[in-house]
């Protein structure tokens, strides 16, 4: 084997050869487009290529191919290293969240698995169980960040999967085995596939639930805080102003959840195999029998840490990542986990995604520097006031499907604020536009993992390949929700928001500044 073949073989590891050739082609083509055709076209090509690497996440983790494309983009001048740093610092809360909050949830796994196992054993109806996951995620994400909620759900799902996988492999509950290795599973493969299909349903219901709750409050999503700051709204005012859109969407989202499970369409409706239920019930009984006073104390400490987590985030007592760090310290200190390697294991899952998010911010920097969204923004602001709400909602939604919704929301609200200060739009129109931006970035963005950081985190987590949740599968399962949420959001914005906002203003519930 000559050196060139050896380099090609080691390049991107076990990824398919056609995929390696695609990435090499992108790296060759991008500078040519940038220098000889148009920087604008090159920028959109980079965005499309990055989305492609995300869609192939099960073939190759997107960090390496996406990272190479991002490095080249900086090297040829599509953006600068300084601007990348500025984007990272502007989104540093997200970095801290991924580093510490996800690791903090790891140390609450014992309590979470105990509670959700009880839930799974007690609730026999798949519809009620799906609804419970959807509404739990909705409620939690109204006060917590959606990434935190998804981290909890992933932790629980991995726990369930691991319990059955060990038994199906012929091991006991206590054995330490590689749950990604199916070689020892011979007779139970069909049941394992059914279990995977079952796990995908509540996971996707919860993921969409996090978006339903995230749109409602100013702490639900990072861009909500930015929008609330520009509009000078408090917690209650934000909730009230968004309610004419968020409440109908929530009701229709819940109905969609029930209909999907009832008609067993779009990959939903798979039931928990009886044998798996038996394994989980035995596991729960065994844990109950073997639970010592020390175990109960540990779960009590984790419960108190969970209460602090909800209160701290709901009242915004500190940044999300800092609260996550306090969870790590409290849980490890009082549960007796002081070994450096034991603590280090909690960081194994979030760190690759944290690195991927930094690469994503590089692509965002390219979007800003090459003004890829500027033609759309100019078109929306030049429209007549009656059409502006619909246009802001639609274009926010479309751009949020392919780009970070925090970035899209920030760009649009800043442009709207500039238009207000320039007297291009009135204050009343600005308030309505702010709601359109908030709902536009949060609702249609469930269509793809690109728009919602929580969805991207789920797709690139180690749990996704275990249950065969690919990019395409996520698109397919999210499709009915995308259609319902987007249409109901649009209709509510057009026909309910202006009259109900005026009504609340007349009642004195909200004020026009």
From Swiss-Prot:
Pfam families: NhaB
Coiled-coil regions, chain positions: none
Keyword Hydrolase: no
Molecular function GO labels: sodium:proton antiporter activity
Reactions mediated catalytically: 2 Na(+)(in) + 3 H(+)(out) = 2 Na(+)(out) + 3 H(+)(in)
Function in brief: Na(+)/H(+) antiporter that extrudes sodium in exchange for external protons.
Keyword Cell inner membrane attributed: yes
Membrane spanning residue stretches: 21-41, 88-108, 119-139, 243-263, 299-318, 322-344, 350-370, 389-409, 477-497
Membrane topology field: Multi-pass membrane protein
Organism in which the protein naturally occurs: Actinobacillus pleuropneumoniae serotype 5b (strain L20)
InterPro entries: Na+/H+_antiporter_NhaB (IPR004671)
GO CC terms in record: plasma membrane
NCBIfam families in the record: NhaB (TIGR00774), PRK09547.1 (NF007093)
Main subcellular localisation: membrane
Subcellular location: Cell inner membrane
Keywords linked to the UniProt accession: Antiport, Cell inner membrane, Cell membrane, Ion transport, Membrane, Sodium, Sodium transport, Transmembrane, Transmembrane helix, Transport
Record's protein name: Na(+)/H(+) antiporter NhaB
Family of the protein in this entry: Belongs to the NhaB Na(+)/H(+) (TC 2.A.34) antiporter family.
């Amino acid at each position: 084997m000559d050196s060139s073949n050896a380099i090609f073989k080691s390049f991107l590891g076990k990824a398919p050869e056609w995929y390696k050739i695609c990435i090499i082609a992108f790296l060759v083509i991008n500078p040519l487009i940038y220098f000889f055709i148009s920087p604008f076209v090159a920028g959109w090509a980079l965005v499309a290529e990055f989305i492609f690497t995300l869609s192939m996440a099960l073939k190759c983790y997107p960090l390496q191919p996406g990272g190479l494309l991002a490095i080249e983009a900086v090297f040829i001048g599509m953006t600068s290293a300084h601007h990348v740093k500025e984007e990272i610092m502007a989104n540093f809360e997200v970095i801290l969240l991924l580093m510490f909050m996800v690791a903090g949830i790891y140390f609450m796994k014992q309590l979470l698995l105990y509670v959700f196992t009880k839930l799974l054993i007690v609730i026999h109806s798949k519809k009620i169980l799906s609804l419970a996951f959807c509404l739990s995620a909705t409620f939690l994400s109204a006060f917590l960040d959606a990434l935190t909620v998804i981290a909890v759900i992933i932790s629980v799902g991995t726990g369930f999967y691991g319990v059955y996988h060990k038994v199906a492999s012929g091991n006991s509950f206590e054995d330490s085995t590689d749950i990604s290795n199916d070689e020892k599973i011979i007779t139970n493969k069909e049941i394992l596939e059914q279990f995977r299909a079952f796990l995908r349903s509540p996971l996707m219901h919860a993921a969409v639930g996090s978006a339903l709750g995230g749109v409602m409050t100013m702490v639900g999503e990072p861009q909500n805080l930015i929008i609330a700051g520009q509009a000078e709204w408090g917690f209650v005012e934000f909730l009230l102003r968004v309610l004419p859109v968020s409440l109908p969407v929530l009701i229709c989202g819940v109905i969609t959840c029930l209909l999907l499970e009832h008609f067993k369409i779009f990959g939903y409706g798979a039931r928990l195999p009886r044998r798996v239920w038996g394994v989980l019930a035995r596991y729960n009984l065994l844990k109950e029998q073997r639970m010592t006073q020390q175990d109960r104390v540990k779960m009590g400490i984790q419960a108190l840490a969970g209460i602090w987590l909800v209160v701290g985030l709901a009242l915004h007592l500190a940044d999300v990542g800092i609260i996550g760090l306090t969870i790590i310290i409290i849980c490890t200190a009082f549960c007796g986990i002081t070994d450096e390697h034991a603590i280090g294991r909690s960081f194994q899952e979030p760190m690759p995604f944290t690195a991927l998010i930094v690469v994503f911010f590089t692509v965002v920097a390219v979007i800003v520097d090459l003004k890829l969204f500027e033609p759309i923004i100019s078109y929306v602001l030049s429209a007549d006031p009656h059409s502006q709400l619909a246009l802001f909602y639609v274009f926010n939604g479309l751009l949020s499907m392919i780009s970070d919704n925090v970035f899209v929301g920030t760009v649009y609200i800043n442009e709207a604020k500039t238009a207000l200060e320039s007297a291009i739009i009135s204050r009343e129109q600005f308030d309505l536009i702010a709601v359109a931006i908030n709902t536009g970035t949060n609702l249609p963005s469930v269509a793809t993992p690109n728009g919602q950081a929580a969805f991207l985190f789920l797709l690139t987590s180690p749990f996704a390949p275990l249950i065969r949740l690919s990019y395409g599968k996520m698109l397919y399962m999210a499709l009915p929700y995308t259609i319902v949420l987007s249409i109901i959001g649009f209709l509510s914005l057009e026909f309910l928001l202006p009259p109900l906002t005026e009504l609340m203003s007349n009642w004195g519930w909200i004020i026009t500044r």
